[in-house]
């Protein structure tokens, strides 16, 4: 009998990927395809939803070819996706009526300002666990309905569908038969009540979005639909697991118990802590979000978003040309023992959790005549760890959970110097797993559970393997001193507002 696999579709911000996993949770093969980014105005970011779809199809074909397996060896498909990115399409033609508005896009700032002025902040925060911010899907849907000719009329007539990227891909893979999303993605829209687990009529009224546009919301591990055979090499394969990228990473890191946390170091950083079956309302600028719905239970998480992390390293490479490649940052930073008092606050697009200060801009402090390129690079790396501590402290204050370990993933975790400093500044153990593609692995696990490929979460938890552990080597006195310097730098950055 031929070996069976789970296929994970990992649809990200700059590329789509298809990754094959075997029963041990190991990567068998992967394929990746980048797609075009559109920047029609400053601060706006858009994608072509059809190009995303064709990139996914290309990755599926490529990964099957590279692995030399047949489509009938795929037991189930999991989908994980860039969250909040918004697609609106015509129900009759299946064609998007506008480009996909990406999570990073700030084109709905005007709408957000109006909602705040109208006094809706508390209602939205109370029901969704989120803030009024262009980041989330609801204002993006409203923008499309308000700005695309004829869109509002078509929506009122029940002729338009809205979906996050998971919804769009399921719709296409199922041949237009299925319009669904999962709890984790729905919880990022600004339209979903995370307590009642329903689309909220009051929120829809505030945003002026017709309910007929919205997908059905289902658990994160369930057979939603089968692929139509003409999109999957003659096979009808169950699409059986869905989660937004950060929730999928939490699941892939096997953070199944209350109080377990992970940090993903990508373009930005996303720190999530499992808070169990009760949502925790944050008083410290964190988001309350749904982690997943599995085994008939919905579990929640606290989330902190750091806007600039890996992109600060890219800036050193592409903007300042201080390094030739991202890995070189570790070698350079290792040549000095400290930053010699230099702090870099990478508020290039404002500051995220816990500050939510969109007006802040990047700054460097503590420069002297003796400051070298090495100090500057080290300060940039350390800024990732300091921002993570900002979020972690907010989490501890909200949850009263004393975190002992942090599981990490994402591109920057290969940097041993950064991971050691992260452990030092947090005062906790940092664990780096063998399989670092935890986002794709999480969606594969969700799909595999639904089709019986894996028995339960206990079996999955045993597959999590630690590649390297970083233990705190810094005194509390030293870490506290360094962190106070960071806090002063952030305070100074936020107080500098230059009005042109």
Swiss-Prot record:
Pathway: Polyol metabolism; glycerol degradation via glycerol kinase pathway; sn-glycerol 3-phosphate from glycerol: step 1/1. Belongs to the FGGY kinase family. Glycerol binds at residues 83-84, 135, 245-246. Sn-glycerol 3-phosphate binds at residues 13, 83-84, 135, 245. ATP binds at residues 13-15, 267, 310, 314, 411. Activated by phosphorylation and inhibited by fructose 1,6-bisphosphate (FBP). ADP binds at residues 13, 17, 267, 310, 411, 415. This is Glycerol kinase. Homotetramer and homodimer (in equilibrium). GO terms for cellular component: cytosol. GO terms for biological process: glycerol catabolic process; glycerol metabolic process; glycerol-3-phosphate metabolic process. Key enzyme in the regulation of glycerol uptake and metabolism. Catalyzes the phosphorylation of glycerol to yield sn-glycerol 3-phosphate. It catalyses: glycerol + ATP = sn-glycerol 3-phosphate + ADP + H(+). It is an enzyme of class 2 (transferase). GO terms for molecular function: ATP binding; glycerol kinase activity. Its EC number is 2.7.1.30. InterPro entries: ATPase_NBD, Carb_kinase_FGGY, Carb_kinase_FGGY_CS, FGGY_C, FGGY_N, Glycerol_kin. The keyword Transcription does not apply. Keywords: ATP-binding, Glycerol metabolism, Kinase, Nucleotide-binding, Phosphoprotein, Transferase. The phosphoenolpyruvate-dependent sugar phosphotransferase system (PTS), including enzyme I, and histidine-containing protein (HPr) are required for the phosphorylation, which leads to the activation of the enzyme. PANTHER family: GLYCEROL KINASE (PTHR10196:SF69), SUGAR KINASE (PTHR10196). The modification Phosphohistidine is found at residue 231. The gene is glpK. The lineage of its organism: Bacteria, Bacillati, Bacillota, Bacilli, Bacillales.
């Amino acid at each position: 009998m031929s070996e069976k696999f789970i296929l994970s579709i990992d649809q990200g911000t700059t590329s789509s990927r298809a990754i094959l996993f075997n029963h041990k949770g190991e990567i068998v093969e992967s394929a990746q395809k980048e797609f075009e980014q559109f920047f029609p105005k400053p601060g706006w970011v858009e994608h072509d939803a059809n190009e995303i779809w064709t990139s996914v199809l290309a990755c599926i074909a490529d990964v099957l070819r590279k692995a030399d397996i047949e489509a009938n060896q795929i037991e189930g498909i999991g989908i994980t996706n860039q969250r909040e990115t918004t697609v609106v399409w015509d129900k009759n033609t299946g064609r998007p009526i506008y480009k996909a508005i990406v999570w990073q896009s700030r084109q709905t700032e005007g709408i957000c300002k109006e909602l705040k002025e109208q006094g809706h902040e508390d209602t939205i925060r109370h029901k969704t666990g989120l803030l009024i911010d262009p980041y989330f899907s609801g204002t993006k849907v409203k923008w499309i309905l308000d700005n695309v000719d004829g869109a509002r009329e078509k929506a009122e007539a029940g002729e338009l569908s809205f979906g996050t990227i998971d919804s769009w891909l399921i719709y296409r893979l199922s041949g237009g038969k299925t319009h669904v999303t999962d709890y984790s993605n729905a919880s990022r829209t600004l339209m979903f009540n995370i307590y009642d687990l329903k689309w909220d009529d009051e929120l829809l009224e505030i945003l002026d979005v017709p309910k007929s546009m919205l997908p059905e919301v289902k658990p994160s591990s369930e057979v939603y639909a089968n692929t139509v055979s003409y999109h999957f090499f003659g096979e009808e394969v169950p699409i059986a697991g869905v989660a937004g990228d950060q929730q999928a990473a939490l699941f892939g890191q096997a953070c199944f118990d209350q109080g377990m946390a992970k940090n993903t170091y990508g373009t930005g950083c996303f720190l999530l802590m499992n808070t169990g079956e009760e949502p925790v309302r944050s008083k410290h600028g964190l988001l309350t979000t749904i982690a997943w719905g599995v085994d008939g239970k919905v579990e929640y998480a606290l989330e902190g978003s750091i806007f600039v992390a890996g992109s600060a390293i890219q800036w050193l490479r592409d903007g300042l040309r201080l390094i030739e490649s991202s890995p070189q940052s570790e070698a350079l930073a290792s040549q000095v023992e400290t930053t010699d008092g230099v702090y870099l606050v990478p508020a290039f697009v404002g500051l995220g959790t816990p500050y939510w200060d969109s007006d802040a801009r990047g700054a460097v402090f503590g420069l002297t005549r003796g400051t070298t390129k090495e100090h500057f690079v080290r300060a940039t790396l350390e800024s990732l760890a300091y921002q993570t501590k900002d979020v972690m402290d907010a989490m501890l204050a909200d949850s009263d959970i004393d975190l002992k370990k942090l599981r990490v993933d994402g591109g920057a975790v290969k940097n041993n110097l950064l991971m050691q400093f992260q452990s030092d500044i947090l005062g906790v153990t940092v664990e780096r797993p063998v399989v670092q593609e935890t986002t794709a692995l999480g969606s594969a696990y969700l799909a595999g559970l639904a089709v019986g490929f894996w028995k339960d979460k206990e079996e999955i938890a045993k597959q999590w393997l630690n590649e390297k552990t970083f233990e705190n080597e810094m005194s509390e006195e030293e870490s506290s001193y360094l962190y106070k310097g960071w806090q002063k730098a952030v305070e100074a950055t936020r107080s500098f507002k230059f009005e042109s």
